[in-house]
């Protein structure tokens, strides 16, 4: 018995030393559902906010969102900006890809008149602008789109066939060493969008990797893997994407949760669709056959009609959202178990 007590004391001392050296949340038990008390910004997806464990993306931290082309990376970040602006936050978008569409951003709820936008000429300029905005202490959310487009100045000024091995990785490593402490002090959320590349010659295991070296993987408090897993159809017409996001790293709550939601073209994340699905799953919305009911009142036959009813009754939708958030964020283990059950069913169906 004494041996177990000594082990417990030694473990507690080791955990205390690790947290003292590397910060709160550097190590935790996977089953520990107690999330850190950190200010967060909603992603616009209720399910993803719950999967993150703290109600959204954390302020004062670095976040990486990566995935294949057309998976919804920029849409998700624009949704974060829209939610941040609603909360009175100042947002900036560093558009290294030179591909930001202000009309599409406005459709997602972004106040484009108040959004700070920069289209830098090279990677060094982009990261210097990011550093200056963070140091100002006046900007709350900064999106960098994307790491792959942060081309080093030497590569731009060189000839097309020149070799520039490791330049971008060194640039990112140096920038993140400078930025991380300032981001924490300024309580600013910095989100890096990243692309996926294939490692050559990988016979076993996952050949996918992200650009820009390993520094961003280490410095990120949250890493989100976003994928398009299907199409949303209205009859024969495709009107959106079925999207799956997996939390592959999380320093603020247990990681490895995943969530599915819909991204509708020209509209963004389908919040009302999530309200219906999560409401039914957690018995806040009743489903009988094709009919959906809330508080004993029928709200529509079929999911599309129920979503339309919620869109026409925003007060009720807000009430339902608050109930779902209160229940799931108060009991994150319930949401985690529901995810595990869902994933198990999907695997059985696949087999």
Curated annotation (Swiss-Prot):
Keyword set for this entry?
ATP-binding, Cytoplasm, DNA damage, DNA recombination, DNA repair, DNA-binding, Nucleotide-binding, SOS response
PROSITE patterns from the entry? RECA_1, RECA_2, RECA_3
Compartments, record wording: Cytoplasm
Does the keyword section mention Cytoplasm?
yes
Q: What is its main location?
A: cytoplasm
The terms under GO molecular function for this entry are: ATP binding; ATP hydrolysis activity; ATP-dependent DNA damage sensor activity; damaged DNA binding; single-stranded DNA binding
Q: Does the keyword Ribosomal protein apply?
A: no
Which Pfam family would be a valid example here? RecA
CC terms in the record's Gene Ontology section: cytosol
Q: Which CDD domains match?
A: RecA (cd00983)
Q: Name one GO biological process term.
A: DNA repair
Tell me the SMART domains matching this sequence.
Answer: AAA
**Which residues hold ATP?**
67-74
UniProt record similarity statement: Belongs to the RecA family.
Q: Which HAMAP family match?
A: RecA
Q: What does this protein do?
A: Can catalyze the hydrolysis of ATP in the presence of single-stranded DNA, the ATP-dependent uptake of single-stranded DNA by duplex DNA, and the ATP-dependent hybridization of homologous single-stranded DNAs. It interacts with LexA causing its activation and leading to its autocatalytic cleavage.
Record's protein name: Protein RecA
Which taxonomic lineage is given here? Answer: Bacteria, Pseudomonadati, Pseudomonadota, Gammaproteobacteria, Pasteurellales
